[in-house]
């Protein structure tokens, strides 16, 4: 069983959901990013979703765009991102790690080489944000060749064909987007049909569903679980804490620890 499969089986046995924070690798720099990721893992994060910094991200709102820029300005490269991933995996051999990135970063290395490097660094799953289902075949093939689980986004306006396609291609977990638009902790509105989408995904035997976009408070984690999901992903709210404490690293780690504990506590059904 993969790390994600093992995690969801363990959580189900305990009647718990998953809390998965997202941060950008090397934000605000390599060493502080490692401390930040360790703080998340040590304070209850069930899995980690980590972003490769990119200068022109499609789905990212201003908070995560700023994180990308900080990492790039600190000299972060794909090379350094893989080094940081390997360091995290070495310290945390059990925690599931998913990568979120844009296709251009993969093209720079070729599909096969990129997924090989993911496997070597201990990555479990990869979500390529800008690859539609219609163009996913080569990515899925390369991922599976190297034991990486391909993850796809189910948008709130998904028709039946899209729901079926996401369910059939996604492994590890299914990323259910709360609403249309870009990531944001401020925009916490959710599409009205999410409960129906969850039912439709489950009818197609989709991988466990994690809801993302606009998840910033413990009660929203509880709401996600009430819909029938297996947990929630929080990106902008997590990254905002980093942004707020750029000049005070100890305070940043302290606030991230408290935030993670509170969000995780909300997953106890």
From Swiss-Prot:
Keywords: Amino-acid biosynthesis, Aromatic amino acid biosynthesis, Lyase, Tryptophan biosynthesis. It comes from the Bacteria. Pathway: Amino-acid biosynthesis; L-tryptophan biosynthesis; L-tryptophan from chorismate: step 5/5. GO terms for cellular component: cytosol. It catalyses: (1S,2R)-1-C-(indol-3-yl)glycerol 3-phosphate + L-serine = D-glyceraldehyde 3-phosphate + L-tryptophan + H2O. The keyword Amino-acid biosynthesis applies. The active site is at residues 49, 60. GO terms for molecular function: tryptophan synthase activity. It is an enzyme of class 4 (lyase). InterPro entries: Aldolase_TIM, RibuloseP-bd_barrel, Trp_synthase_alpha_AS, Trp_synthase_suA. Its EC number is 4.2.1.20. The keyword Lyase applies. SUPFAM superfamilies: Ribulose-phoshate binding barrel (SSF51366). Tetramer of two alpha and two beta chains. The alpha subunit is responsible for the aldol cleavage of indoleglycerol phosphate to indole and glyceraldehyde 3-phosphate. Belongs to the TrpA family. This is Tryptophan synthase alpha chain. It comes from Actinobacillus succinogenes (strain ATCC 55618 / DSM 22257 / CCUG 43843 / 130Z).
